Amino acid sequence: MRARIAANESAAASQVRTLNTAEVSYVTGYPAQGYGTLAQLGGPAPCVPVVAGACLIDNSLATNYAGKGKSGYNFAIAIINQGQYVATATPIAVGSTGVNSFCSIEDGVVRKDPAGALNATEAACGALAALGN
């Protein structure tokens, strides 16, 4: 079980990094829009980049894997305003699908919460320790 949790956590942290990269690309490509939601970063196939679906991430991630999460984690992006976002990955079942939750804000640093809590505010995420990688 520990090996599965470790694999899930590694995948979740990697997805948060992917979301950071996509946010930088989105805000660069659509500066008047600001940062994008999960849906705005994705787009259904065949994907043609537009503000509502920029084709920067796989549409499976953009839909949080049809609302079911992936590898034991749920993914979300909260837009605070055009200049701030919080990307999160939280365990579906803390202690069995994952222990740590992960988040990142516009500084691009992935942080972890050993309690597995949802840290969907800029202040909550920013107060956590950076993931050591």
Regions of interest found by a model, annotated:
Residues 122-124:
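Short, charged, solvent-exposed linker or helix-capping segments at domain edges/interfaces
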Residues 1-25:
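Amphipathic alpha-helical segments typified by the pilin-like N-terminal helix
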Residues 18-100, 104-109, 114, 127-133:
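Extracellular/periplasmic head regions of type IV pilus-like filament subunits
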Residues 116-120:
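A short acidic/small-residue loop/turn micro-motif
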